[in-house]
Amino acid sequence: MSKSENLYSAARELIPGGVNSPVRAFTGVGGTPLFIEKADGAYLYDVDGKAYIDYVGSWGPMVLGHNHPAIRNAVIEAAERGLSFGAPTEMEVKMAELVTNLVPTMDMVRMVNSGTEATMSAIRLARGFTGRDKIIKFEGCYHGHADCLLVKAGSGALTLGQPNSPGVPADFAKHTLTCTYNDLTSVRAAFEQYPQEIACIIVEPVAGNMNCVPPLPEFLPGLRALCDEFGALLIIDEVMTGFRVALAGAQDYYGVVPDLTCLGKIIGGGMPVGAFGGRRDVMDALAPTGPVYQAGTLSGNPIAMAAGFACLNEVAQPGIHETLDELTTRLAEGLLEAAEEANIPLVVNHVGGMFGIFFTDAESVTCYQDVMACDVERFKRFFHLMLEEGVYLAPSAFEAGFMSVAHSMDDINNTIDAARRVFAKL
């Protein structure tokens, strides 16, 4: 047995499923998850000594690559001053100033510890600000594991939501309406059925949890218009896309102005950080200035703030996003060329430093139904053969891939060459 197999066997006796987040268990592709010993640049190194070109990037945060010296040094320096104070620090002010400068739609920002905390708190704030209970989310989008978000559509387009996890009371789920991503007609229908009850729409501007599905040109502006028409708030969940699709996020890339924005992943530079912010009048409703309660023992932790501050300063340097786009475009084009040579039907979506690989005969993938029609079994074989080639992709057909500026063009070309060999075996 490999060391990863031994560790996984031991972990399953002590940790549910052997992992601390379900997708890591390889349940989406089968087999034994790799246990990682270290990471540097564009590479992961497992406990058995094998190196992999990494396109997971810790599920998004590692836009600069692993173990970036500026972030590592900032963490070490901050740790020497203390680990946590439970009191305000100068770095929190500097971090808030930096974030609000980089994302102009955020007049104010509140730091939390995860993307789930950010979305959960933003929805509570939207409900408190509007005095309404219902929310709209989209089929195939994921916004963390808060009860009100673990909801699937009912049997009809306008039925009340149903829990998709045991432990979520139906009374919670009934306030969540699930519409079809990239379909404004379904959203208008929900508003027309509940015109005075919907507090907010929450949306991934690029859906990254049904692989990678960009918005159609009219979709995000249409959501903005519907929110304005019916008096609801628009929450854009930029936990994945923030500082990755563009410096000011996908909202800037696509030209839409939200009322609230949720951030995570890159904002922490690899440390557990989330944030939410937006319009000053909305944020003023948050405690202690307003009645909507939110708190956190480790929110604004000095080490996490130092890591995030260092990361965002690096991400803000000229050329970062152009490099991400160039590398991702080359990877997408190369994979499509290699698949065509092997007569493998393939669609590769990509935006900025995100991409998605779909085994499908369809010309495009634009919604949840398109994603579910893809050949998941072929993806599983593709994943394991690429892993044997030393390429680490997301272990699920429903998760986006992430590029970093630490990837070289040689890494990209080697990945394409590996895919060419793998396609010949599929």
UniProtKB/Swiss-Prot annotation:
<keyword id="KW-0413">Isomerase</keyword>
<keyword id="KW-0663">Pyridoxal phosphate</keyword>
<dbReference type="GO" id="GO:0042286">
    <property type="term" value="F:glutamate-1-semialdehyde 2,1-aminomutase activity"/>
</dbReference>
<dbReference type="InterPro" id="IPR015424">
    <property type="entry name" value="PyrdxlP-dep_Trfase"/>
</dbReference>
<keyword id="KW-0963">Cytoplasm</keyword>
<comment type="similarity">
    <text>Belongs to the class-III pyridoxal-phosphate-dependent aminotransferase family. HemL subfamily.</text>
</comment>
<dbReference type="GO" id="GO:0030170">
    <property type="term" value="F:pyridoxal phosphate binding"/>
</dbReference>
<comment type="subunit">
    <text>Homodimer.</text>
</comment>
<dbReference type="InterPro" id="IPR049704">
    <property type="entry name" value="Aminotrans_3_PPA_site"/>
</dbReference>
<dbReference type="GO" id="GO:0005737">
    <property type="term" value="C:cytoplasm"/>
</dbReference>
<protein>
    <recommendedName>
        <fullName>Glutamate-1-semialdehyde 2,1-aminomutase</fullName>
        <ecNumber>5.4.3.8</ecNumber>
    </recommendedName>
</protein>
<dbReference type="Pfam" id="PF00202">
    <property type="entry name" value="Aminotran_3"/>
</dbReference>
<dbReference type="InterPro" id="IPR015422">
    <property type="entry name" value="PyrdxlP-dep_Trfase_small"/>
</dbReference>
<dbReference type="InterPro" id="IPR004639">
    <property type="entry name" value="4pyrrol_synth_GluAld_NH2Trfase"/>
</dbReference>
<dbReference type="GO" id="GO:0008483">
    <property type="term" value="F:transaminase activity"/>
</dbReference>
<dbReference type="InterPro" id="IPR005814">
    <property type="entry name" value="Aminotrans_3"/>
</dbReference>
<keyword id="KW-0627">Porphyrin biosynthesis</keyword>
<feature type="modified residue" description="N6-(pyridoxal phosphate)lysine">
    <location>
        <position position="265"/>
    </location>
</feature>
<comment type="pathway">
    <text>Porphyrin-containing compound metabolism; protoporphyrin-IX biosynthesis; 5-aminolevulinate from L-glutamyl-tRNA(Glu): step 2/2.</text>
</comment>
<dbReference type="InterPro" id="IPR015421">
    <property type="entry name" value="PyrdxlP-dep_Trfase_major"/>
</dbReference>
<dbReference type="GO" id="GO:0006782">
    <property type="term" value="P:protoporphyrinogen IX biosynthetic process"/>
</dbReference>
